[in-house]
Regions:
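C-terminal motif of bacterial Sec signal peptides marking the signal peptidase cleavage site
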Residues: 17-20
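Bacterial signal peptide processing site
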Residues: 22-25
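N-terminal capping segment at the start of a domain
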Residues: 27-72, 83, 297-314
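Second-shell loop/turn segments in exported
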Residues: 36-43, 58-67, 94-97, 139-150, ...
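A non-catalytic alpha/beta surface segment that caps or lines the substrate-entry region
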Residues: 54, 58-114
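Solvent-exposed loop/turn segments at secondary-structure junctions
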Residues: 62-64, 93-96, 114-115, 125-129, ...
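Active-site-adjacent substrate-binding region
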Residues: 91, 101, 219, 226-335
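Acidic/histidine-rich catalytic neighborhood of metal-dependent amide-processing enzymes
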Residues: 141-242, 274
């Protein structure tokens, strides 16, 4: 994704999540009383999510038109299918910033596909073809591993998918792994013009031609860079403009679960990310849960962002836990 005046914040302490319950009120017409009915939310397994992140990284950089990209795409589709999802492979030839044809593949897993009430969960699975933010200029044309920027959001959602198979929520859930989010114009080729259209190619394509004709969802949650050590998440600007009630819902859940040190009660800047096409083209209110840091000098997304250091060393199970348990809480409390 491309930074748009992104605000930065100091990392706070780490909190662990576990099995949680939320209460919904049920009124008895006969007695005129209100009782509490507990909603059982599954426990997110951070070890499982960590493994899913590592298995993606083990393929190497998942860049467009590469063997690793093909193999990892097959792995992700097979994983979703093994968890009981109806899987769609949406393939398309898309045009990169330099005019080259990129073989894109959006991977969609639909849980309870016949349900009318649906929630969309998404992340991008491709990795940046260029480490163009690396402090060593010699690395700028090398692809990154994308453990955090790519694999972390997908890893969290694969664990969510595993839980959906074991305990079905009251609604339908669609998990989308968008391709070609991170093939936007590299810094060494940037011009003074607006190049925002060169990013988020997979989500742009899906938003114009969804996997199901007339597709709709109540709301969407995008996960991007959600596995780094000491990660903090601010209320991203476009999310607040286009889906403020969803932001409120997610941040409230995180605070209730004890993850307020990750989900900071403060507005952040604006980020050009996959939630943009979901909001603006598909017209589904979608928010972006994305890392922001005050202490890192190279980028508010972390010193390892778009560098060769974005590897498994930066991934923290506690961060995966905070994000994953929060997402599960939101999904299972939807009626």
């Amino acid at each position: 994704m491309k930074i748009r005046n992104y605000m930065m914040l100091v990392c706070a302490t780490v909190a662990l999540g576990c099995l949680s319950c939320a209460n919904s009120k049920k009124t008895s017409a006969a007695e005129g009383e209100t009782t509490e009915k507990a909603v059982q939310v599954p426990a997110f397994n951070a070890d499982s999510a960590y493994l899913y992140v590592k298995q993606q990284v083990d393929f190497g950089p998942r860049t467009p038109n590469s063997r690793a990209h093909d193999l990892c795409g097959d792995y992700l589709a097979a994983r979703l299918e093994s968890f009981g999802a109806k899987v769609y492979n949406q393939r398309a030839d898309l045009t990169g910033y330099d005019g080259k044809t990129l073989k894109a593949r959006n991977i969609i897993g639909a849980f309870n596909p016949d349900a009318k009430r649906r929630v969309l969960l998404c992340a991008h699975w491709d990795t940046r073809p260029w480490a163009d933010n690396d402090p060593d200029e010699a690395n700028h044309h090398k692809p990154i591993l994308g453990a955090n920027d790519g694999a972390s959001g997908v890893g969290v959602l694969l664990e969510v998918a595993r839980q959906l198979q074991q305990q079905a929520p009251a609604i339908g859930v669609d998990i989308i792994f968008f391709d070609m989010e991170d093939s936007g114009t590299p810094q060494f080729a940037s011009s003074m013009g607006d190049d925002s259209h060169t990013w988020c190619l997979g989500s742009q394509y899906w938003a114009r031609a969804p996997h199901v004709q007339g597709y709709n969802a109540r709301f969407g949650i995008l996960l991007d860079m959600v596995g780094g050590k000491g990660a903090t998440f601010l209320r991203e600007g476009y999310s607040m403009q286009q889906a403020p009630s969803v932001v409120k819902k997610v941040w409230k859940a995180a605070t209730k679960l004890g993850f307020g040190n990750y989900f900071i009660d403060e507005d952040g800047g604006y980020v050009n990310d996959d939630h943009g096409p979901v909001n603006e083209i598909a017209r589904i209110p979608c928010i972006d849960i994305i890392n922001c840091s005050l202490t890192d000098e190279l980028s508010s997304f972390g010193n390892f962002w778009h560098t060769l250091d974005d590897n498994m060393d930066v991934i923290d199970r506690a961060t995966l836990q905070a994000v994953g348990q929060t997402v599960l809480h939101v999904v299972y409390n939807e009626k």
